[in-house]
Amino acid sequence: MKMPITFDPAKHDITLRKRGLDFADAAKVFAGRHATISDVRRDYGEPRYITAGWLSERMVVLVWTPRDNARRIISMRYAHAKEEARWRKFLG
C-alpha cells in the first residue's frame, strides 16, 4: 500500500545537512525492495518500525511511525556494513 511520507522539517534539514539524505526519498525505499520489522526496543507511546531498503544502490535504514494515514519518518541513515549483512537475509 502506497502511503504518503511526512516528517518534521527541522529533523529533515538536519539529516539532509549531516548525512546527505532527504526524508522525501523514503518513498523510493518503500517503492523498491525493502524489509520492515517492529521497533520493540522500548515503549515509544506509538508503534514504530524499522525499514531497510535501497536508495541509489546503497542500503538505508529508516525509523518511522504510521500517523494520519501516512508514514512519518523519524530518522534515516546509511546502513553500516555489519547491519547491511544482517538485513540482506530479509532482502534476498
Language-model features, listed with the residues they occupy:
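Ribonuclease/tRNase effector modules and their secretory precursors
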Residues: 1-92
